[in-house]
């Protein structure tokens, strides 16, 4: 079912000369760093759509997951949204959320997030009247304990 060539390159376009190619910082890095194409200021408690000026073609049966960078997370910067569908071809934008106490500045060329390619399965959904029971049932949000 997943007949994809893992050696096929992913095609991308730099939409402007401000765009920087996605990069991996080590041979085994899970994600490709995405870079801001512009300067932004994000006050505490606010969010901002950061444009990369990169568009790309996702591999077949894959989607792109926008994930936080650990160094930014340490500063209180998180990611909102974060899914690039297989058929999306527009400018990749990253929603940065400033959960910190201080204004956060993004400069042109800053690494803002990482793009991780993940396989996806498109199941057929079927509505039913009830589901099989399990020991856990409908117990959620902390029901399995802390330890």
UniProtKB/Swiss-Prot annotation:
Catalytic EC class: hydrolase
Catalytic reactions of this protein: dUTP + H2O = dUMP + diphosphate + H(+)
One Pfam family named in its UniProt record: dUTPase
Any GO molecular function: dUTP diphosphatase activity
Organism domain of life: Viruses
Binding of dUTP, residues: 68-70, 82-85, 88, 93, 95, 111
Annotated SUPFAM superfamilies: dUTPase-like
Binding sites annotated in the UniProt record for Mg(2+): 24
EC number(s) recorded for this UniProt protein: 3.6.1.23
One GO-annotated biological process of the protein: dUTP catabolic process
Keywords, comma-separated and alphabetical: Early protein, Hydrolase, Magnesium, Metal-binding, Nucleotide metabolism
Cofactor: Mg(2+)
Induction and repression of expression: Expressed in the early phase of the viral replicative cycle.
Entry function: This enzyme is involved in nucleotide metabolism: it produces dUMP, the immediate precursor of thymidine nucleotides and it decreases the intracellular concentration of dUTP so that uracil cannot be incorporated into DNA.
Family: Belongs to the dUTPase family.
Protein name: Deoxyuridine 5'-triphosphate nucleotidohydrolase
